[in-house]
Amino acid sequence: MTPKESIGKMKRILFVAAVAICALAQAQQQRTIAGASPGGNSPYATDAYPGFDDVDDSKPPERREPSWLWWRRPKKATPAEQYAYAKELEAAEDFSGAASACDALVREWPSSVEAPQAQLRFAKILAKEQEDYVEAFAQLEYLFDFYARDCPYLELVEYGYKLVNTMRDKKKTWFGLSFLSNKQVRRNYESIVRRAPGAAYVPEAMLKIAEIREEDLQYEEAVKVYEAIATKYPLRIETRTAAYREARARMWLCRRLAYNMVRCGETRGFLRQTMKRYPDIEQMDELKAWLEELEKYMDEAAYKNAKSYDSRRRTPHAALAAWELFLKEHPASPHADEARARIAELSAAPRKETSK
């Protein structure tokens, strides 16, 4: 082999090695980017969840840096020794010390084998021993963001869901004021849904999201979530609950924005569709009452509109068209006989007068 051929062969070997190193580095980088890895063989959901906050509004996760405070630094020389030290503190019921030791390990040796274990132990100590559910969930999110492939992903997302339920049930208050906002709880539920869209508890979680929207008087957004439940999980029992609650939210909007006849018409159609789809629904009497209320309101509004056209300021032709439209859309109205009589009267008028 000539020197020229040897150099060419060496260049090819170096090129292949460089490509392999770049691919390895890229794979490692993807593991540390939030959302790059679903973990647990469970694909992330798309961001197409109407009624959820936009993920772009959330702050992107960042790795925790080693603390410059000496008392928050690792007490041992290696991650293995530090993790063993944290477990010793936990066994001695020094939970605050154990949590700090786990945190220090993750900060100092983020790429170590012990880091995911320490991060999980950190989150569970916060939840179980210190009952700091908000911070525990935040640390669990950190585990998902940076160590998704290094943990039992689906099992821990379900644990996170239970954590948010506990967070919501045990909201701490001070003189009636809560330290935890509905928005934060809702966003935690939304995160759970996005991380495990195929989990069995997701429809239930979405009901909770919509419920919180209603508590905050965000009925437009609540309706979107209820619609998403019906679209994504049509065969689940939660869809019946979502249908009733959507009807209730729509009625709230109709009463609040009664001038919007298009909305009233859409809600009337939704009520009829829901009653037809679920003839044995428990809230049937309530749905019927809402439909009757809505039809009565729309009937009166249409009657007043037709009457407004039947005046000296309008032509007989316009009045005739208004009454015909009213009768077509509201044939069972209490004002139907009056409308028919007026149509007959206007139709019998001289053609010249009617065509003005």
Listing of model-derived features with the role each one plays in the protein:
Residues I13-I21:
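Sec-dependent N-terminal signal peptides
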